[in-house]
């Protein structure tokens, strides 16, 4: 997933807000390899400092992007007024982390096979309209980057400094997510005073932003005027 899974939301919101869709390091269209979640957080904070005076109204993030957002909130308590974190894991998975390199080492070549890509895409429960974006970008990601950000994601744990964030944090997870994501959502909510957790019935990983852009955009409007 990348900027394109927020494309429709941006189109809906752009009449009222300036919407910026960053590309995380190592993803298709990025200008440098992936190094760490913290490095991505620092880079986005630096961009906001330079172009936005150090503060924006709202930041949203899904999965790896949600982890980057959590790190940003930990590093800069007032980086945004509102934060929307979706399907972010903060419970490390040592086994998955250890298996990432050998698994991608043996199967990386398959990602350019459309039939295999369609099977992978179906397992993600994403709307069909996003397949071409998914396939194009997946084919452009280097193996080293894919391994790097998968390992970073499976090793990520919540920065204790998150408790000091000044942002109003809204957490979303799908009812049908795996247990690690649901447990993570509870852990994040418990770590951030005043945060709000919504578990969305019937949804899988990232299903809120990926498959219901109208509702996601409306939620942003409601949060931003709360």
Task: Enumerate the language-model features and the residues they cover.
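Conserved alpha/beta-hydrolase catalytic His-Asp/Glu region
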Residues: 94-96, 110-163
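Flexible "cap/lid" loop of the alpha/beta hydrolase fold
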Residues: 70, 74-75, 80-110
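Short beta-strand/loop motif that positions the catalytic acidic residue
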Residues: 165, 171-173
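Gly/Ala-rich beta-loop-alpha elbow adjacent to hydrolase catalytic centers
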Residues: 61-65, 69
